[in-house]
Amino acid sequence: KGYVPMESQYDNSVSHALEYYVADYALSTLAEELGKKEDAKLFRKRSMGYKNYFCKEFGTLRPITKEGRFYEPFDPKEGANFAPSPGFHEGNAWNYTYYVPHDVYGLARLMGGKKSFVDKLQSVFDEGNYDPANEPDIAYPYLFSRFKGEEWRTQKLVKELLAKHFTTKPDGIPGNDDTGTMSTWAIFSMMGLYPD
């Protein structure tokens, strides 16, 4: 089928699937380096399964039921601030929709192209749907840099996020450090670097 169906209301099916797709992409890259072209092709194709979850109505990823239909009723903001969310772990559709690091340009095409992608991504920040304490969306500020002429957005947002969410106080990082994830994000960002 190419997707993980939703078995129960709060089963994290979309979150799990997205991690599988990133792993499949990594396996395709490894297989290619090993000269296993058929395996590389298989894993690369599987890594594109995220497209099954894309819902044009909302412009986000959306859980799919066992029957192969989009989950209803659906609110892409449900699950904000770590509240339970259908299909997503510790987040919502906005925290996960852009979590396709291996196919950013493919996701942009699904969304209608560069302008639509950039506008929608900017709205994630403008409307308070970005969660700096949640790993799936911590790369979001850097996605603007993938598109020529939009790099300034990355520079502006990273500067603002560092000033707002990272301090020298005991609670100076958003959420918890999750084995160094948040502090590493801050250090890379302060240096003006971000691993791709």
Residue ranges of model-derived segments:
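Active-site core of glycosidic bond-cleaving carbohydrate-active enzymes
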Residues: 1-196
